[in-house]
């Protein structure tokens, strides 16, 4: 029965992608780069809550043209809500990306096969996300629109974590039968954000950048949030090219941008930021339509959340960059087993 349901969900996934596959006449290079995100809480000496994620982002015009793309639906939603009117009167340009990834969540005691009702539920999400970045250079303003579609509760989550824990010689997780939407359930999230650059001293060898962003999500995470992001050092990429605030645990894939100074020293900078979020609903903790053995009620999850992050980026070859970061969040649910989730991540990117 479970395999039959998962087969039906895969069919829904393929149909949605085929319907979404449209090409728009936007002047943009076919391939502007790629980015690989690797998150894991073992790097932060933890093994619970958001325990890890991996995502590959491909950017450029190809993100609109790939068979496995949600660009048509995302663009239709923007048009339905009149998002295009926000930037249409002023000079602007647009960049696109598509991301494929997965995220895993566990309680603290992963050796226990029985349901654990007073800790975070097991959870997983396998997803595809399409993003459009619109930049208005004269106003130092940028907009992000992202549509994420995926599946909660797939059996593949257990096998992936077992493989990772075999490599790291960690305990085997035995409770995946109790995960949110166990057996598989489709889900989605639509994200809109606007960001404003406040400081950008382009002519200095080392410079500061400071920007604010406001974001709203509707779907498997429904929330509103505001953030402040900063970076300092030897910077050759535009202010809108780094978006640590655009994340739902793992960073949602934004377009990759090349540096504007390939004759001078390569990039080397630090970055940091913080955000405040008011979350109305989280499918990864409260479940969705399908029955979940372990899930929280609305009263058991924290509504007001805060996050902080700190990272560093090094361009070790022309337009090839590596980043390492730490990220921490306030408690996401109530009770004695609630902790402050902390995780670390490695990002490798190549821009063209």
Language-model regions: role of each:
Residues 28-30, 62, 94, 124, ...:
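Short coil turns and loop connectors of transmembrane beta-barrels in diderm outer membranes
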Residues 54-60, 100, 128-134, 149, ...:
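Residues on the lipid-exposed face of transmembrane beta-strands in outer-membrane beta-barrel proteins
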Residues 63-67, 138, 198-200, 235-238, ...:
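Repeated loop/turn-to-beta-strand initiation elements of outer-membrane beta-barrel proteins
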Residues 113-118, 173-178, 213, 294-298, ...:
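Extracellular loop and loop/strand-boundary signature of outer-membrane beta-barrel proteins
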Residues 78-158:
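Long, hydrophobic/aromatic-enriched structural stretches that serve as scaffold segments
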Residues 34-40, 96-104, 147-153, 192, ...:
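Transmembrane beta-barrel strands of outer-membrane/channel proteins
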Residues 48-54, 122-126, 143, 182-188, ...:
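Residues that define the transmembrane beta-barrel architecture of outer-membrane proteins
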């Amino acid at each position: 029965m479970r395999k039959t349901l998962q087969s039906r969900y895969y069919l829904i996934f393929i149909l949605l992608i085929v319907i979404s596959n449209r090409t728009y006449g936007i002047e943009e290079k076919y391939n502007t780069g790629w980015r690989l995100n690797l998150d894991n809480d073992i790097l932060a000496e933890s093994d619970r809550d958001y325990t890890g994620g991996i995502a590959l982002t491909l950017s450029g015009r190809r993100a609109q043209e790939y068979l496995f793309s949600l660009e048509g639906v995302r663009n239709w939603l923007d048009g339905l809500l009149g998002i295009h009117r926000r930037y249409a009167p002023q000079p602007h340009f647009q960049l696109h990306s598509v991301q494929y990834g997965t995220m895993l969540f566990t309680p603290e005691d992963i050796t226990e096969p029985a349901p654990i009702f007073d800790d975070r539920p097991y959870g997983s999400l396998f997803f595809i996300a399409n993003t459009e970045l619109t930049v208005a250079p004269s106003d130092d303003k940028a907009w992000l629109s992202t549509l994420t579609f995926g599946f909660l509760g797939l059996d593949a989550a257990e096998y992936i974590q077992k493989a990772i824990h075999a490599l790291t010689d960690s305990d085997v997780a035995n409770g995946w039968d109790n995960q949110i939407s166990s057996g598989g359930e489709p889900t989605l999230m639509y994200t809109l954000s606007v960001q404003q650059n406040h400081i950008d001293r382009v002519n200095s060898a080392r410079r500061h950048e400071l920007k604010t962003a406001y974001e709203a999500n509707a779907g498997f995470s429904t929330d509103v949030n505001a953030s402040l992001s900063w970076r300092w050092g030897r910077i050759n990429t535009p202010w809108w090219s780094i978006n640590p605030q655009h994340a739902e645990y793992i960073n949602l894939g934004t377009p990759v941008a090349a540096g504007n100074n390939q004759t001078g020293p390569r990039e080397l900078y630090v970055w940091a930021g913080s955000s405040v979020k008011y979350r109305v609903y989280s499918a990864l903790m409260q479940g969705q339509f399908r029955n979940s053995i372990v899930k929280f009620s609305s009263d058991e999850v924290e509504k007001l959340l805060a996050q902080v992050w700190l990272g560093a980026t090094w361009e070790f070859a022309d337009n090839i960059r590596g980043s390492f970061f730490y990220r921490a969040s306030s408690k996401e649910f109530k009770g004695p087993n609630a902790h402050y989730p902390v995780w670390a991540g490695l990002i490798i990117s190549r821009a063209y």
